[in-house]
A protein has these predicted regions:
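Secondary-structure edge/capping motif, primarily at the C-terminal ends of alpha-helices
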Residues: 82, 111-118, 176-180
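Hydrophobic alpha-helical connector segments
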Residues: 66, 80-106, 161-165, 188-191
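Helix-turn-helix
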Residues: 2, 20, 24, 28-62, ...
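Short secondary-structure transition hinges
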Residues: 101-141
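C-terminal peripheral helix-coil segments that are non-catalytic and often amphipathic
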Residues: 1-5, 138-150, 163, 167-206
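Short, basic, alpha-helical segments at the C-terminal edge of helix-turn-helix-like DNA-binding modules
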Residues: 69-75
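Membrane-interface starts of transmembrane alpha-helices
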Residues: 10, 154, 158-162
Length: 206
C-alpha cells in the first residue's frame, strides 16, 4: 500500500513540475515572444536546471506545443461546462458558439507577444489542436442528437452538421479576434441574429 502511494506521489510531482515549466514558458513567450525566449530562460525562470527541463521537453518547439495544448484544454473544459448546462439544445448551441469564440479571443489577447506566433506558425497550431477539434465535433454531435431526438432540430445527418458547425466557428476565429465581425455591434445585439441564422439552418421546430 505504501509503495502505491509513493508511485502516485512521484507521478503527481512529475506532473506538477512539467506544468510549472509550461506555465513559466507561456508567460515568457507572452512577454518576450517565442523567438526571444530560450530553453535556458525557461529553466532559470522555473527555478530548475536545464537538465531537468530537457527531461520533459526535447526542444523549445515541444514546449510551445505544450503551451498551445494547455490553452486548448482550458477552452475544452469551458465548453464541457456549457455542454452540461440545463438548457434547450438550440440555446446550448448558441452558447457553445460564443463560448468558443470568446475563449479563443481571450487566449490570444492574454498571451501578448505570443499572439503573432499563433498566426505565423498556424500549421503547428493545427497539429496540436487536432484532438481538440475532434472533441468539439463530438460535443456538437451530442447536442444535435439530443435536439433531433426531442424534435427541436430537423437534421438528417447529425455527424455532418456537427462537423460543418465546428469548421464554420473555426473560420470565424481570426475575424472575431480582430473585431471584424459586426463592427460597432455588441455581442448582446448579435446573439438574436446569430440564433435566427443557426435555427433556420437546423430546421428548428416551432
Amino acid at each position: 500500500m505504501q509503495k502505491t502511494y509513493n508511485i502516485n506521489r512521484d507521478s503527481m510531482s512529475v506532473s506538477k513540475t512539467r506544468q510549472n515549466f509550461v506555465d513559466v514558458a507561456r508567460q515568457l513567450f507572452a512577454k518576450n515572444g517565442l523567438e526571444n525566449t530560450t530553453m535556458n530562460d525557461i529553466a532559470q525562470a522555473s527555478g530548475k536546471g536545464r537538465r531537468t527541463l530537457y527531461t520533459y521537453f526535447e526542444s523549445k518547439d515541444e514546449v510551445y506545443s505544450a503551451v498551445i495544448e494547455y490553452e486548448l484544454e482550458r477552452l475544452s473544459d469551458k465548453l464541457d461546462e456549457v455542454a452540461e448546462l440545463r438548457m434547450r439544445p438550440q440555446d446550448k448551441i448558441i452558447e457553445l458558439i460564443y463560448t468558443h469564440l470568446n475563449m479563443i479571443k481571450e487566449t490570444v489577447v492574454r498571451n501578448g507577444n505570443l499572439r503573432a506566433e499563433f498566426f505565423r506558425n498556424i500549421w503547428m497550431v493545427e497539429k496540436v489542436r487536432k484532438n481538440f477539434d475532434e472533441d468539439e465535433i463530438e460535443l456538437f454531435r451530442k447536442v444535435y442528437a439530443a435536439g433531433k431526438a426531442s424534435g427541436e432540430f430537423d437534421i438528417d445527418n447529425v455527424e455532418l452538421i456537427a462537423t460543418i458547425t465546428h469548421y464554420c466557428i473555426k473560420g470565424l476565429e481570426v475575424p472575431f479576434i480582430y473585431g471584424r465581425l459586426g463592427r460597432g455591434v455588441t455581442e448582446l445585439n448579435t446573439r438574436p441574429m446569430v440564433a435566427k441564422f443557426v435555427y433556420g439552418a437546423l430546421g428548428k421546430q416551432r
